Amino acid sequence: MIKKLSSQLLLILIVLSSKAAVGDWTVYPSYHNATYCEVAGNKLYVLASGALFSYNMEDNETLLYDNINTLSDIDISHIAYSKAIKALVIVYKNANIDILYDDESIYNISDFKNKTLPSKTINNIDIQGSTAYISTSFGVVVLDLENLEFSNTYNTGFNTYCTYLFNDRLYTGTSEGVFRGSTKDNLLDKNNWEKVNYYPTQAFCELGGELYCLIRDLGIYRLNDENNRLTLIVKNSGEKYHTIYNSGTEIVAPSKDKVTIIKSITEFTTYKTETGSSFIKKNGNTFWSCNSYSGVVECKIDNDRLSAIKEPLQPNSPVRNYCEFMKFTKDGKLLVTGGTLNYFDNIFHEGTIMEYDYSTLKWFNFPEETIKETTGLNYVNICSIDEDPTEPGHYFASSFGYGIYEFRNKEFIKQYNHLNSPLESVHKSGAYIERYVRIPTVEFDNEGNLWCINTGVKNVIKILKKDGSWLSLNYKELENLPTVAKPLLDSRGWLWITSLQGEPGLFCAKTNKTLFDTTDDEKKIWLNKFTNQDGISYDIYQLYAFIEDNNGHLWVGTNTGLFIIDNAENFFKNGIFKQIKVPRNDGTGLADYLMSGVYIKSIAIDGANRKWIGTNDNGIYLLSSDGLEEIHHFTTENSPLPSNNIESIAIDHTTGEVFIGTNKGMASYTSDATAPEQSLNENNIHAYPNPVRADYSGNILITGLTADCNVKIVDTAGFLINEGISLGGQYSWNGRNSRGEKVSSGVYYVLTYDSNGNEGVATKILITR
């Protein structure tokens, strides 16, 4: 008999088949903005958004490199290929160095990174043979690529942009001009360096036994090695040249809108390129153009310009490493925005909205240029986004400065600001009034009404109702506060609103279940200072995290630590916050406040009511439901987290995957808790993997359970093998018996009971050893 799978069951099977094992990490670096590339035989290495990918020019295979599968670090600043050792030298912004060989093996050199120096900024890397000359903010560091060791450090005291060995003389282009020293002399002695000229030089290269240099703002010159005279070859005009390099028989000089090919002192040709090129690599008759918007494009000469001959290379990835806000839609898609609350009017992140589809593992980056063209205004600092619960594919996104943007099927359709809606600008008049329509948050309620926080104005709360009409709510306590940010309608029907900084704190309104009528509300606000149950008061400067857990308790994350409201009625009366006390268990009987003094930026609640706490500079914590137990503490030292500065957290409650947004990009961790079901149903209970094959070493997951579900695993004879309690809707079994031994091949039954001991349901697992 052929059975048809329901779409819901098919979705479950797809999710299970692609589900990572508990404890697995995934990173999501952006590979979008291509800035540099290197040719290595039939392979093209591309530096994009601080990440690395390669393209095989023979079989068209693309490989993505990250700090889980290959690399030792993140945030690459420079790459350079050495033909002598057949390896790519990778330099990171923190001065860490990887050597990636053609056979995909890798060697890390962290000596320079670990040195204590006033500055370790690396400006460039020039490779000649098996020597890498690293130009730094203080001079030149020489790396022997054969022996994988630093052979010399020349502390010239000048900010050095480029280094080149020519006729036994080492040339450096610095902020103070060009210097050189003979390799026969002791170059550790600054007196053995001579100043050639005072022109700030960006790059050197050699052609036909002559030395050429690129002088900032001026152009490309030949530098006579004997008399130090400069001869102009090509003058900088329009977009300035980025660099110069030898492609074999020619010098190549790329700029944003052109590339010049120099064959001799008197022979050169300039070709137009696509606007926005950050680097162009010549390989035979082919050019590879790196572009901020379109990735890497293969081009060839077509009359007086370079023309693309293939579709751009741009791996599917986030458009940027911005992820200040993250939220899951009802159908399991992750929405990400990259804006910041530009309170001081000095940070302008490009308008960034991204969607990650877990079922296809694909990213979609919302359009940007069309918005700027349509509105005639900047498109920056997108702080939040939400999907209409009554119309999938209908989105609203907020900007801290330019109002609200409406999208349908990911296409921009309308901007709302002070001119066409009740939204208000912080400034009532002036030339830049349109820049100050500050909307940190938009969020739909269950009825399809869009709640908008309009900070810094009189009527902070604006509601775009489902019927298209607008409603403004006034609370005098919130008028003109500079960073009112997030609304929360709790399980009691109370409205809470946070103020982040400037005047940080909490506002609460008992709405009497009349949300759109404020006249019958009881209201209170707590600003700048919090007092705990022991009478200790804290000055609060930032309040970024506020969330209700599954028990109705409210968790507040501030710059000075973690606070709890476990009885909202009492809190409304006395304004006393609770700080959890964690016993020291050292015989003193003393306890410490949980996470006291820790700067908290984000909090999320998982399916087992556990708390994921993101900090400003100390990574992310997982706490037990009551906060008394620290289950995990992940940092860049013990995990692939891109940074210890955690901006946002979003949890896929179906899979248990925790997405973590940092100031340097995103990662996810597969946890052991999912959202619980309301009741046990054998059709919803699944084991993964199933069957369990001999080469599998991870945990076996049983999903589709109720909260605090009792799970027993027995063999075919009915003997108890393992038992425990589910975390949310999931139970994890390590495939071992009570003695810690791996169970043998066979069929094992999973017996499940709810927290009252009722409704026993069975599924089974096949294990093959």
Regions found by a protein language model. Give the residues of each.
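Glycine-centered coil/turn sites that cap beta-strands in beta-rich domains
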Residues: S679-K712, Q730-W733
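Edge beta-strands of extracellular beta-sandwich domains
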Residues: G760-I765
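Hydrophobic h-region of N-terminal signal peptides that target proteins for export
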Residues: I12-K19
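Short, surface-exposed loop/turn motifs with a glycine/proline- and acidic-biased composition
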Residues: N67, S726-G757
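Carboxylate-rich, polar loop motifs that coordinate divalent cations or form catalytic acidic clusters
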Residues: K4, A20-I685, L720, L751
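Interdomain boundary/hinge segments at the C-termini of tandem beta-sandwich modules
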Residues: I767-R769
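Short, glycine-anchored, charge-dense loop/turn motifs used at functional sites
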Residues: N710-I721, Y748
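Bacterial N-terminal signal peptides that target proteins for export
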Residues: M1-L9
